[in-house]
Every structure is written in C-alpha cells, then in structure tokens.
Amino acid sequence: MPGKLKVKIVAGRHLPVMDRASDLTDAFVEVKFGNTTFKTDVYLKSLNPQWNSEWFKFEVDDEDLQDEPLQITVLDHDTYSANDAIGKVYIDIDPLLYSEAATVISGWFPIYDTIHGIRGEINVVVKVDLFNDSNRFRQSSCGVKFFCTTSIPKCYRAVVIHGFVEELVVNEDPEYQWIDRIRTPRASNEARQRLISLMSGELQRKIGLKVLEMRGNAVVGYLQCFDLEGESGLVVRAIGTACTLDKLSSPAAFLPACSSPSRELKEIPFNEDPNPNTHSSGPSTPLKNQTYSFSPSKSYSRQSSSSDTDLSLTPKTGMGSGSAGKEGGPFKALLRQQTQSALEQREFPFLTLTAFPPGLLVHVGGVVSARSVKLLDRIHNPDEPETRDAWWAEIRQEIKSHAKALGCHAVVGYSESTSICEEVCILSASGTAAVLNPRFLQEGTVEGCLEQRIEENLPVGCGFCHIPYDELNMPFPAHLTYCYNCRKQKVPDVLFTTIDLPTDAVVVGKGCLIQARLCRLKKKAQAEANATAISNLLPFMEYEVHTQLMNKLKLKGMNALFGLRIQITVGETMLMGLASATGVYLAALPTPGGIQIAGKTPNDGSYEQHISHMQKRINDTIAKNKELYEITPPEVSEEMIGSPIPEPRQRSRLLRSQSESSDEVTELDLSHGKKDAFVLEIDDTDAMEDVHSLLTDAPPPSGFYSCNTEIMPGINNWTSEIQMFTSVRVVRLSSLNLTNQALNKNFNGLCENLLKSLYFKLRSMTPCCLCHVNFTVSLPEDELIQVTVTAVAITFDKNQALQTTKPHVEKSLQRASTDNEELLQFPLELCSDSLPPHPFPAAKEHLESANSNSGIPAAQRAVTVEKASAMGDGNFRNRSAPPCASPTVGVVKMTPLSFIPGAKITKYLGIINMFFIRETTSLREEGGVSGFLHAFIAEVFAMVRAHVAALGGNAVVSYIMKQCVFMENPSKNQAQCLINVSGDAVVFVRDSDLEVMSSQQPAANCQPSCTGEVTT
C-alpha cells in the first residue's frame, strides 16, 4: 500500500452531560476512514475522559488519502438504547502529504454537532507514512501544494507560471433525496457535510493531476465554490493558477533572474512585495491601464481549442504598435510574438492572481466580463458533468474573445461566480485583459536581449497605464492623452481593473472604497419566462452599475479603480447589483473633469434654481473629497501633454471596424469624450434619484479609511495591530408595494449603516484603515436581504510622514501594543500579540455570545487553542530557540490579507477548506437571527483556529468566507445556515522577534531575510 494512516485518540474535555441521572457521560470514540472503522473503549462517568487509545492504523491508497476525510465521532454509550451522538470532527489529511509541510496533526479539536454546535473538545494525534510510488498511471496528486493567496506566496519564488486550471464535480444533494423525508435533521446535515468534504478532496486531487501534467508543483489563487442547485444537485467547482514554485532557502535566492538587478528586493524575488517597507504590509501588483468593458453574455457552442480559430490570441493587424511610437513598435511586436508562443497551447490563458512578480504585467487592456442565464436541470450522471462544463466553457470563450479584441493575449485577476434562485442560475466571470512578460510563462523562451528591452521599455510607475492597443484602431471610443509621467505613450482618462494596485504605481493622495448599489424589481415567473426576464434586465443593470461607478469616481476626484468586484444576485422578485472597488488618483492619468448637471426644462426658474443648488453641492463635495484624500496633483502644461486623440474622422473609422455590439459602444461613449466635465442629464425622476444618491454617500469619520484591496493606496506606515471581523446583517423588507427607488434607498441605507456601525465599534483604534472589505449580498428568501462583510482593521502611525510617490521607502514602524484593543466596545478577534499578560478578549464580535451556546466559556476556549499549539508554551523572547524558529503565539491569528503586518511568514502548512452546517429548532431561545448567526460564526472561527494550531501554525492568511447561506422559518422557530471558509495555514515570526534572535545569534547562523527555513 502506498500509505499508512495512524490515528491515536488521547482524551476529551468539557463534554456535555448525556446522563441526567448522574450528570455525567459514558463516552467513546469511533474513528472512520473510508470503509474502515475503529472504536475506543468506553470511558465511564466522566466529562473529561482519558482514552489514551492504541494507534489505529489504516492502510489505504494515496488517492483515498486525498479524497477521504478522517471522521471522528464521539458518542455516549447507552446499554438499552441506541448510542447518542455527541458530535463529530472532520480532519483533512492533505496537509500531511507535502514533503515540506507538517509531519503530524496533534491538538485539541472542537467536537461539532450540526444541531447543538460545539460540545467539548477531543485530543487527537494523526500521522501518515507514505511509500514511494512510481506508477505512471496513478490517480493521485500527492505533493502538489495549494494556496488560497492570489499572489506568489512568501518564502517562494515563481520559476514558471503555467496558467489556468479548473475542474468541477457534481452529485446529488442529500438534502433533496427521498430518504431525507424519513431521517433526522442531524443525519441529513451530516450526510451533506460528509459528501461535500469528499467532493472537495476529489476536486483538489483532480486539479493536482492537471498541474502535474503541466509539470507544475503548486496551485496559487485556488478558489473553490459550492453551487447549491436544490433538486438539480450539488456542484463543487474550483479554479486556480498552476505554477512551479521554489522554496527560498538562501540569501542568494533573493536576487532572481526574473527581477531587475537595479530593483532592491527585501523580500522574495517574485514575492508580492518588492517594497522593503511593505514587505510584510503589502503585496506588489504591477497593474496595467484598464478601460472598462461590460459585455452581456452571449451563447456560444462548445468547441475544442484547436478549432477556435476565430478566438486566436494573435492581435489584429497593426494593433499594439500605435501607442509605442517609432521606438515601441518592433519591441511590442517581439514581445507579443514571444508571449503568444508561451500561451498559444492553452485553451484559456487566464490567471487567478491579483498580485504579480515584478515585471510580469506589461500592459492592461481593460476589464472584460461575461454573464449567462441558464435553466438548471437534474444531474443524471454525476460522473459526466458535461452540461456544467459546457456552460463555463462558453463563458470563458467569451472572456477570451473580449481580451483578444482589446489586443491582449491573457486575462489576469480572473474570477467566476454564480447566483441561483429556484431553477435559474446566473453564471458570471470577469477579469482584466493584459499583456504579460513571456519569461515568467515558459522556461528558456526569452532571449537575453528581449529581457533587456523589456526592462528598458517599461517606465517605472506608469508602464502599466499605457494602452496595449493601436490608438488608430481602438476597440472602443476613448479619450487618450500622453502619459503625465513619461510623456511618451498614450494613456486613457480613466482606468478600471480587477487586480490590486502595484507597489511601483505613482499615487497622489490616498484611496477610498467606492461602491455602486442597484436593485431592480421583476415579476415572479417560472422556468424559461423567468430566465428571459432576467436576461433582459442584466444589460441595463450592468450599464447603470457602470454609470454609478464613473459618477462616484469623479465625485471623489480620482481617475482609477482597482480590485473591482461586481455581484449580480437573483431573487424571486428582484435583482440586486453590488460593485466594490478602491478608487485612487494615478499620477500618470489626466486629472478628471468635474460633474456638470443639465436639466431638460431650462425655462422653469425654480427648476433651474434647484439644478444650480445641486451643482454647487456637487462642486463642494468634489473639493472636500480632494482635501480629505490629499489629492493635489502637480500642474502640467498642455503643451507637454499633447492633445487628446482620436479626432472625429479617426473615431468614425474605428467605429466601422468595431466588432462589438452597438450597445457597448454607446455605453462607453457616455464615459469617454473630449469634454472637461462629465455631464449628467436629468430628464426624469430616476436621474434625479441617481444624483441624490451620489450626495448621500457620507465620507468615513475622521481617522478612518477603507478599501477592498489588500493595501490602502497612499499609506505605508502600518503597525502590527490588526483586527479581523465578520458581520452578517439580515433585513426583511416591510412594505409589499416597493418601487425601484424605494428599494434602492433601502439597500443603500443598509450598506451605509453597516459601514457606520463598523466605524463606531472600531472608534478606539483610530487612525486605522479597513482593508480587504468584502461585501457579499444574497437573497435567501422573498423580501429578505442578507449582507455579509468581512474585513480587517489595520492601524497606522499618523505621526510618520507618508510616502506616496516612491515604491521603496524606509522600514515602517512596528508596534505590538494591545492597549487600543482593550478599549474596544466589544472583542473583535480571538487573537493576541506575543505578550501573554494581555491577551485579546474573545474571538471577533462573534465569540462574545458563544459562551451560552457552545457549552465552553470563551476564556476556556482561548486557553484551549493556546494549549493546542504544537509549538510549546512560554514566551518566545524568554526562551532559547533555534534560529528562524516560529514563536509561541497564544491564539491563532486570522486575516483576509496574504501577509501579517510587522511579521514574516516562514512556512506554509497547507490549505484550510471547511464547510459547516448549523440548524436550530429554537431560534428565539438562541437570541433570534442575530444570536444564532453570531454564535455559529464564532464556532466556525474556533474550529478553524483549532485545525491550524494542530498543524503547528499560528495564523490563517488569505482567509475568505466564500459562502454564508441563511434560511429561516419564523413560524416554526427554525433556522439553518451553511458556511464555507478557506485560507492558508502558516507559521509567522514577528520582526521584533527576528531582531532579538539576530542579536543573540551570530549573523552566519541566522539570516533574518530568509525568515524561513524551518526544517521538520
């Protein structure tokens, strides 16, 4: 057998009382893997049993080790009746299958029950012995590493970025099987959890096989999603970017061949952070200029990649030579030829990365998106999911064709999502069309002369802004000017992108969160009629969302959006759209014009006075925003910049060559043109409401900033004080006769009040910034709106001078104080710094109510996780430790960022991908919807932290709550919630601890810059 799994059950504690007569429990444990089950002895009359079982050994294939989870069930022994279930623990074995990962899983795991929540803890030790397997026909992919982070992980360098990998598996949903009518809710929930865990493991294994076929060893930007299609079935799908990664182990590796010798890198060569100041506080993301392009989905028949001649990656004749002038033409042609050779063999040249190694991105062409409305049908054969594959293939082919139309050969920042209601499913995909540097895509394909030309032809701070297409044959009408930085090539007047801001970008002032919110009512319908109505609404919703983004961007006095994420959610009676992005002012782009309001009835005196008043308010708002975000661009004469192009005659020529729909051209005409001001024409009530909504967005309170990217543009002086939080708000619409205007007002108020409540609760942390703000909107029931927000609050030093125009700054100040956290109105995060006397209170805003729901006090749970750590006890600074070892941290930190400010990640232990179901039949007794969700999310955090601590980790980075599906039945006092979370388990070391170690150890024995060879 290629693998032997060994499990030992040590002890349990804080078990619930199962025998009312004695107020004790007769507990035993069943250990199951695959079809084999072992049992421990019954430990009589104790709430803290000590089993100390023998080693249970499972001899299995490595394929099963990847697919199957280890199931540990704790039961109460009953002599005369069936044994009562206390709870279960699912342990993923995959992290033990990496050669450089953990060798043992050991710790206290919360015992989870889908009805009662956490019911005590169990101490388990798991080991795996793998045998060498040289079978060329094997179906396992052991050794392929998975990372949730959408950038090259710390401690690694990218040798080759192979490209896009995807897979999906389907099955019947146990919740909708006939047997569900006769089994208990607990059995149904556990069957669902078990099936999803199996499908998740199978999906990961299949993607790993594809990576091995591409000769890679890792998947970066791994995104797994669950499509709950009801009676149609259950779909688990995932996308990612296949890479070949090398572990950095020596200082010499910090100057790779793929980085410019003149570029000083404090971190890893292809790390997201070439900036020494932000090496732990921000990833590097060379971004390219983007012109926003919404495109409603069209229907394509599935074809093989070899037959897609119309979607070839070869740009149109002349495309790519105009903007570079006489010098850039031959260079761009050579670059495209080299890059195309590396990509032409790939069916979909997509990357799920949003942050990139320095020099990978050459140009960005625009945001490309596609949507399609489908009718769900029952999955007849789970082993052959051709229908769903064909759906996604159509979407990807359309994205590919849009990128080609923009003169680009790749799509970066690519993501996919679905929205399902009854029988209708909306498939959505979006990304950023880009031109990539070929040396990252294939080994040995780029000659040295081309590498030199690439570095010479990319101006620092503005190269990504230059248009990749021919200015005389543009794919859409646009207003171009010469770059305000290098003054050699053309840039657009506005830039939209789905990726993060590059560290070398020259930004004026600070950034801010910009959101566009939209609701549209629709009639109730069934099947095809419903799908048709949704299809007809989608283009208009996309147009209005785009218009809102443009208006709000200009109202802020900014000219670029990064991290754009658009959601279209479908319900029974409405459609909702939510777009989030981070607005910035790029110095390379022209100063945005103002907003001018024009009315339809100029003879009406009172109406003109009203218009004039609104115009004054808008002008005042723009001036205040420029002052608030410190936007003071340097003045540049018009003679140095050049006149805008194209001229009207050239524009008519490009319109004739335009192959896209006339609707898209009209949409872009509204946002581009040779006018100093952006004109808003008020011709009806809806237009008036749009203008009012622009003015009702209140700025954040003094000392607060917010963004949906990892790093707030314009701020570099981060401290080590972070607080992650999740907030879920469910609102039931009261009125049955809502109009679109009233619905929009309610939705805007819901989102604004949610942000205001966060600012209020975090008021003692000022000055701080809410980073990686992730809004998710769903319509679980008719007239029910659910908004979920995940973000992290990071403090910064307001006394340190901000350096916004240089990508490389001095080392940022680091602070490990927890004083502000003690002053919080409520505990936000169950995490602490390395100071044992001052632990953080409880886990997030959610562990506060976990005391009465989980059976374990929050204080005890904090101690539980601390003792579960496999790294020992005590203060790291006061004990002797080997160089570059990981510190002892009392509680596992959680953050949606790919880094931890003021610290270095030394080791990745594996991916955490967990799915939980919680159901209750006593909703009111548990505090209603708020109390139920509050306790459940707290329990999810506790279980995630326990699994990370058992692996020997002390943090979860790139954390994301991908799904939070809530359903309630108030009349029956019932509720159910499904949550899917994922992230990367890591070991990190504080920079202050590294300094202590470097002072105690000889320089030859400890390399702080390597931070990370921990041998196991």
UniProtKB/Swiss-Prot annotation:
PROSITE patterns: C2. Ca(2+) 3 binds at D78, S81, D84. Residues 290-318 have a biased composition (Low complexity). It comes from Mus musculus. Residues 274-289 have a biased composition (Polar residues). The gene is C2cd5. SMART domains: C2. Ca(2+) 2 binds at D19, D76, D78, D84. Its main location: membrane. This is C2 domain-containing protein 5. GO terms for biological process: insulin receptor signaling pathway; intracellular protein transmembrane transport; positive regulation of D-glucose import; positive regulation of D-glucose transmembrane transport; positive regulation of protein targeting to membrane; positive regulation of vesicle fusion; protein localization to plasma membrane; vesicle fusion.
